[in-house]
Amino acid sequence: MADSRDALLAFIVLGAGAVGTVVGGFWLAVYWMRSLGKKVGYSLAPLGFSRPRGGFLAGIGAGMSVGVGAVLLGMIVNPMSILVLERLGYSTESTIQQPFMEGLVGWVQESPGVAVPAIILVVVLFGPAVEELVFRGAIFNGLYRLGALVSTRSFGKDHGRSSTKTIFIASALASSVMFALLHLEPVLLPVLLILAITLCALFQRTGSLLPPFVAHATFNSVAAVLIILSGLKVLNIPI
């Protein structure tokens, strides 16, 4: 229980550091470019802090749809992952996520007034916000822009739609593999990889971090609700 609380606190500290690194690094790059005479501003819009194409409601709706779809996909893919791993002789025991979730359930049982809002704030809101900024706003976005720059310098502005697709696929795969591996759960690896690639596409299509954040928060909210309801003994289900 204490370990889970410590893990939440550590994630907040690391997340805040990651946000500071991304934003600070971006502003430092802007400052350097301005010193070279480039006309660039300090707006965080290039990182995805902007209005989604199609508007806020459309972006939120798209994000919720992707999040719900990911939850349903997980219900199908995760059992298949377990079956494949067991057939290959690998352990499917969760050594990180399940003990963490069980600790949070115990915390809810002990101090629901503190635990419930903390879980919602960190698992549903803060965590997805940090991860979307880092993996979609910074890593995927940075790789895609770098690939587009190299392609333009090499082949000119008319490098073609196929080249753009190749750059997207490479950037999405690289950032999504890092995202999936970060969670250290072999059973969840396929669904997390699919989710991450979809979030890259959602970010690319809308030009905003809001839709992928909503999708990520929707996906995480299912686990948060199960933890809270189990801790409050409303549901008696294995975590």
Residues of each region from the PLM?
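Alpha-helical transmembrane segments in multi-pass membrane proteins
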Residues: 1-49, 92-101
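Juxtamembrane helix-loop-helix connectors linking adjacent transmembrane helices
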Residues: 6, 41-127, 145-159, 231-239
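Alpha-helical hydrophobic membrane-insertion segments
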Residues: 12-24, 28, 57, 84, ...
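Alpha-helical transmembrane segments of multipass membrane proteins
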Residues: 17-25, 66-78, 219, 223
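Alpha-helical transmembrane segments of polytopic integral membrane proteins
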Residues: 25-33, 74, 78, 127, ...
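Structural signal for membrane-spanning alpha-helices in multi-pass inner-membrane proteins
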Residues: 25-34, 70, 74, 123, ...
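Membrane-interface extramembranous regions at the lipid-water interface
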Residues: 33-41, 51-55, 141, 204-206
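Transmembrane helix-loop-helix hairpins at the membrane interface
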Residues: 106-239
